[in-house]
């Protein structure tokens, strides 16, 4: 049974007889950036609770997500923890998730979720709030022409942009489309290539503050600006998200919003355990991202 607005749970009528302790983790990536730390939080919690885990990687491709979900349905796993694929777009695999639900298999999303599954249980960050705080900080530091680089195919990018745009309007600043760059997962590796650097620089030229989708992008922006003899933070302030190791080894240490990596993994795992062991409804969770100010915004 599912009740809108009251969380999600598997009723005694729909829950199948448990066949074991098999939990599948489905993630976009595993080996780099913040993903290993999130996965560690999930693994430690589920392993300590006695569950057996399998790890599946989509590389943010919907066709790979479909293949994995079909395999999980045929294997009849007991629970699934998922990081959605291209969550800003309509997802063609929603019916596969509904099949899992009909089978009585609880699903918990982390980092993002699908709006086409409105009653989902998820653990996400408050991206809109952090995007707003990023602009507020830049305004406090004296910035007036603020640009941004955001990811278009994941929900987090839209949330961060929503806060970014709200902050500009609230502070009476111009929201200039020419100074906002959007990119997809497939385009990230091309953003800062030599044959694209002039385009990127022209889009951000004249900005005195730049909000970047994550630390990887902030690192690329700082490198791009320095190659064009623009100093960070003296001429331009730069903010990233996630407070990853990249923010520390960047030539200019990057001010960044802290992603609650281990906490998110543990929370997602605990929600799944609750759904497996109880018929009480489970609620979504939105986590704050505190600011960690470093060199890239210090004047």
Predicted regions and their residues:
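Short acidic capping loops at alpha-helix termini that bridge into adjacent secondary structure
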Residues: 145, 175-179, 232-237
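Short beta-strand elements in bilobed, periplasmic/extracellular small-molecule ligand-binding domains
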Residues: 47-57, 148, 165-194
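Alpha-helical recognition/docking segments in bacterial nutrient-uptake
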Residues: 11, 15-136, 202-205
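An alpha-beta-alpha
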Residues: 132-173, 283-298
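N-terminal helix-turn-helix DNA-binding module of bacterial transcription factors
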Residues: 1-19, 298
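Short, solvent-exposed amphipathic alpha-helices that sit
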Residues: 33-48, 130-133, 155-175, 220, ...
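Flexible loop/turn connectors
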Residues: 197-299
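Hydrophobic alpha-helical segments within soluble ligand-binding/sensing domains
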Residues: 116-148, 166, 190-198, 218, ...
């Amino acid at each position: 049974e599912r009740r809108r607005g009251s969380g999600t749970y598997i009723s005694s009528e729909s829950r199948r007889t448990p066949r074991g302790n098999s939990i599948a983790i489905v993630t976009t990536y595993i080996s780099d950036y913040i993903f290993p730390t999130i996965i560690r939080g999930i693994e430690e919690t589920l392993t300590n609770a006695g569950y057996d885990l399998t790890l599946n990687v989509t590389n943010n491709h919907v066709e790979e997500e479909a293949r994995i979900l079909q395999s999980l349905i045929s294997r009849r796993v007991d629970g699934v923890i998922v990081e959605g694929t291209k969550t800003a777009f309509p997802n063609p695999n929603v019916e596969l998730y509904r099949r899992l639900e009909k089978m009585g298999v609880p699903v918990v999303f982390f980092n993002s979720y699908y709006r086409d599954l409105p009653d989902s249980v998820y653990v996400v960050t408050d991206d809109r709030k952090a995007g707003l705080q990023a602009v507020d900080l830049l305004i406090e530091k004296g910035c007036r022409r603020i640009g941004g680089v955001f990811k278009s195919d994941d929900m987090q990018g839209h949330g961060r942009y929503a806060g970014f745009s709200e902050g500009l309007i609230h502070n009476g600043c111009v929201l200039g489309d020419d100074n906002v760059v959007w990119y997809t997962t497939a385009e990230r590796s091309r953003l800062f290539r030599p044959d694209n650097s002039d385009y990127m620089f022209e889009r951000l030229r004249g900005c005195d503050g730049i909000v970047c989708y994550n630390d990887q992008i902030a690192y690329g922006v700082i490198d791009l600006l320095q190659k064009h003899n623009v100093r960070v933070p003296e001429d331009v302030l730069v903010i990233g998200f996630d407070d990853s190791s990249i923010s520390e080894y960047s030539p200019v240490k990057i001010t960044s919003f802290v992603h609650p990596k281990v906490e998110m993994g543990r929370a997602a795992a605990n929600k799944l355990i609750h759904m497996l062991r109880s018929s009480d409804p489970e609620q979504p969770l939105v986590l704050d991202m505190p600011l960690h100010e470093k060199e890239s915004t210090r004047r």
